[in-house]
């Protein structure tokens, strides 16, 4: 019997979800898909500079799982940058902060609208 799936936690959905090389029509590009969890792993480790153990704890996953996710994300980003591919950030099964675990396409996973003051 396989182990139960552990829901991954992210702080927010990335504000920009698509990148492509300038000057090349989208129809001529190959595309790499980066999951939302992989983008969060990159953010925690490479942007915020957290240690893998800290980042894994924040995402509610084991350190080896975090490491595999980070390597996968780095490979996809490097492939897109060096080989002129588009990069789409979407998909995955995760929870945003304390919201229930779900897929990005469901309404409960969308970011809260800004509060008006």
From Swiss-Prot:
Signal sequence range: none
Any single Pfam family the record assigns to this protein: DUF134
Gene3D superfamilies tied to this protein: Winged helix-like DNA-binding domain superfamily/Winged helix DNA-binding domain
SUPFAM superfamilies: Sigma3 and sigma4 domains of RNA polymerase sigma factors
Family the entry assigns: Belongs to the UPF0251 family.
UniProt-recorded name of the protein: UPF0251 protein DehaBAV1_0135
Source organism (scientific name): Dehalococcoides mccartyi (strain ATCC BAA-2100 / JCM 16839 / KCTC 5957 / BAV1)
């Amino acid at each position: 019997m396989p182990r139960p799936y552990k829901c991954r936690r992210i702080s927010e959905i990335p504000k920009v979800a698509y990148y492509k090389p300038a000057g090349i029509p989208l129809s001529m590009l190959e595309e790499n898909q980066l999951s939302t969890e992989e983008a969060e792993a990159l953010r925690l480790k490479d942007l915020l500079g957290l240690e893998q153990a800290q980042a894994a704890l924040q995402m509610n996953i084991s350190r080896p799982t975090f490491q595999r996710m980070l390597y996968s994300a780095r490979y996809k980003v490097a492939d897109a940058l060096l080989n002129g591919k588009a990069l789409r950030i979407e998909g995955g099964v995760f929870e945003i902060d304390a919201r229930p675990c779900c897929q990005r396409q469901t309404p409960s996973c969308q970011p809260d609208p800004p509060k008006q003051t």
